[in-house]
Amino acid sequence: MQKQVTIIGSGIVGAVTAYYLSKDPNLSVTIYDEGIGQATKNSAGIISPWLSKRRNQRWYRLAKAGAALYPEIVTDTQMGYSVYQQAGTIVTRADPDDLQALYKLALERRQSAPQMGTIEKLSAEAVQERIPLLTAPQPGVFVSGGARVDGDKFAHNLLKYAEKRNLIRHKGKVRLGDQGQLLTVNGQQSYDTLILAVGAWLKPLLLPMKIIAGVRPQKGQLIEMQLPETWADDVPVSMPEGERDFIPFTRSKLVVGATHENDQGYDLQVSSLVEDDLFASGLKLDANLTKDQISQVKVGTRAYTRDFAPFFGPLPDNPHILVASGLGSSGLTTGPMIGKLLADYVQTGAHDWDQYQLPIETYLEAAD
């Protein structure tokens, strides 16, 4: 008899978990998603964690492992360059001393992360040669292993892959009963294992079980632009100092963003002020941009914890319910490894997660 695994949420964690579980013929997997406000669909999509200034070594190990999974998954599912491309990342610094320090950090971190690939210190002119769109380039450090990913397309491809095997998808909102019952529009549904990969919505979802998840929502907005010129598939992405990320996607699509808005709750309305701010940031890098080239403004809701670290695993008092949340703006980087670890746990019951996170009780508490 097949074991029933139900996943709530089809963002990066839910989709990757479903992908790995689809390889097990002894499992039947069902996924539910309301399809509103998902962070994965509205993310900037740079995979390049190695030069981060974050001091949390658990997070860094998780992000490094997540970045390393992408080539394997992309090859297995035969995704194209429009979904994922290891075109390299350029991180800029105006001050020569800061640039040298960044270059030194990159060389040090490559010793334990060979997937970083080639590392080069580039002049402003050399940066412009790599990214011809730039009209005001700054010197930077190039990491060839850096990549761009379209989070929406990536998750979609994984779900399509899993649907050909053991995945059934449902669109709709679900809720939990006080004992963890799964309640849908079609009534209560049974499961052997339930995975809550709902990001910022974990807190309200767990409240009926009298569990308070220490997560808060953060609004993120970005702009997509369609430019008249085209460029090669291997144009790097730019993480410019003091500005929004600048991401040339395949051919003529440019993404600028994203914002980090802590006071907007679950609001998904496009802000014209934020749109203007994002455009102004892009304009500082490419003076030829025009407002009418904006084709879309994307809005999503991320989940953050008080220490800006993700958490995942079984509920302390219910090993049949797994949760994952708090991925923040690096969710596309850490999400693949979290999804793989959750899938491994479902299949083996074993885990060794201490190297990646604090105890899950750090982020969950009983309601009064």
Model-predicted segments: where are they?
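Beta1/beta-strand and adjacent pyrophosphate-binding region of the FAD-binding site
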Residues: M1-G11
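Active-site substrate-recognition segment that forms the wall
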Residues: T6, A15-K23, G45-I46, Y81-Y84, ...
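Core beta-strand elements of the Rossmann-like FAD/NAD(P) dinucleotide-binding domain
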Residues: V185-T193
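Glycine-rich FAD pyrophosphate-binding loop
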Residues: S22-N42
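Helix-loop-beta segment of a Rossmann-like dinucleotide-binding subdomain
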Residues: G80-R93, E108, G117-Y161, T259-D263, ...
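A conserved short coil-to-beta-strand element within the FAD-binding core of flavoproteins
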Residues: A147, I168-L182
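C-terminal catalytic lobe of FAD-dependent flavoproteins
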Residues: D292-D368
